[in-house]
Amino acid sequence: IGDLVEVINLIENSMYQDDIMKIITHPLPWNKLQNKALLISGATGLVGSFLIDVIMLLNREQGLNCKVYSLGRNEDKAKSRFSYSYESTLFQFISYDINLPFVRNDIGSVDYVLHLASNTHPVAYATDPIGTITTNIIGTQNMLEFACAHHASRCVSASSNEIYGENRGDIEKFEEKYCGYIVCYTI
């Protein structure tokens, strides 16, 4: 239940809402997403959920009409996280394990595949590094195969892993302004 409370608090958080507003008002070519379809894996993760929030707000506020197919493992988390969009015809959540082939006959062409699913938990890297990297490889292959089968113009992969760097030991929780250090040879 703690995760669900954090999700609700994030959506209602004024700093988070300010970040979303800064992004949608930034002079980016949002019109290139007009009447397009996106498939986003890792929908309930850091990058995926923020991107979905931005696109769905652009749909509501600016009539972008961009269909979002969102993939994730936990439907309950998705229902809580995206409750504001769950009934929209422009949003569809699909419960999916990135390790499995993704074959859907109910999805037509998709313009962009954004592969944002990855196990970024440090314990997983430490206790099962091969399983963790294998999931990343298989997941990427599955998304590329889907992109080809559905004639996507682009397929992009990204991760937020260690976006703040390692804790220097001077704080208990990370904040947006925190800049730790990143050591590329640590797992």
Language model features: what each stretch is:
Residues 35, 80, 126-127, 134, ...:
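Phosphate-coordinating loops and pocket residues in cytosolic domains that bind phosphorylated ligands
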Residues 48, 102, 123, 165-166, ...:
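Glycine/Thr-rich phosphate-binding loops of Rossmann-like dinucleotide-binding domains
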Residues 41, 71, 113-119, 155-161:
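SDR active-site strand-loop-helix element
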Residues 51-53, 82-83, 126-128, 168-170:
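Short amphipathic alpha-helical segments
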Residues 141-186:
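Conserved Rossmann-fold NAD(P)-dependent oxidoreductase catalytic core, especially the SDR/UDP-sugar
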Residues 95-135:
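NAD(P)H-binding glycine-rich loop region in Rossmannoid oxidoreductase-like domains
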Residues 32, 117, 121-123, 176-183:
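Short glycine/proline-rich turn/loop motifs
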Residues 2-112:
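N-terminal Rossmann/SDR dinucleotide-binding element
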